[in-house]
Amino acid sequence: MIRTGIVLPTFRETPDDAFAAARRALATGVDGVFCYDHIWPLGQPDRPALAPFPILAALAASVDATTTSRGGPYFGTLVARVGLVPNRVLLGQFVGLAQLAPGRVIAGLGTGDRLSEAENRAYGIPFGPAAERRGDMVELARALRGQGLTVWLAGGQAARIDEALAAGAALTVWDADPALVSDRAHGAEALEVTWGGPAPKANGELEATVCALAQAGATWAVFGWPVDPALLVAAAKSADDETAWSGEPEAGS
């Protein structure tokens, strides 16, 4: 089974669009909603960006849990950036969110990169060496797992395999080729792999993308807004049917 998600439109002055998109998606059957964690959209410091946790908390407090076999709805970050706030603060934010949606919070974590470094620098927030940021990420991931939360670590690099294994986390990749997903999901480590990326613009490509990811072993396909929730849910059903028919093993099995 492949679950579906959307990344909410939070590069706005108000949360209205994010709330509307979330309620539409969840009512249609999308499994989860996610938020970016940026001070501004990449390369656009003059544009607004809403913080993820207030948005997710408001939704978690107002949306009822479902009783279907798919569980949900899930609320997560894609991804929360280690280093923007101290680890203990980020841990507290996730634990607080989990009080509103027990068992349904996904702590997507990342270290940031050269594209997001300017956000730190603009506000005087240290941007440590990559190894230091990765160490902080694994430390936080372990603490979150200790609290019973689901954790995704961002990055498709081979080094992230060891980090995910050390933390007991899944691996999440952004706009990666299904071949990379398959390599990570069906390798000797048998990691859980989730996928996020922009929604295809061409008609018919959404279903093809979701089906390819399901065949590769991805357990989630999360698309940036805008994406048609009804088409996304239909694509996941088609992918599940196709995977069941082909007898493809699930990742980690």
Per-range role (PLM):
Residues 1-253:
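Active-site-adjacent structural elements that line small-molecule/cofactor binding pockets in enzymes
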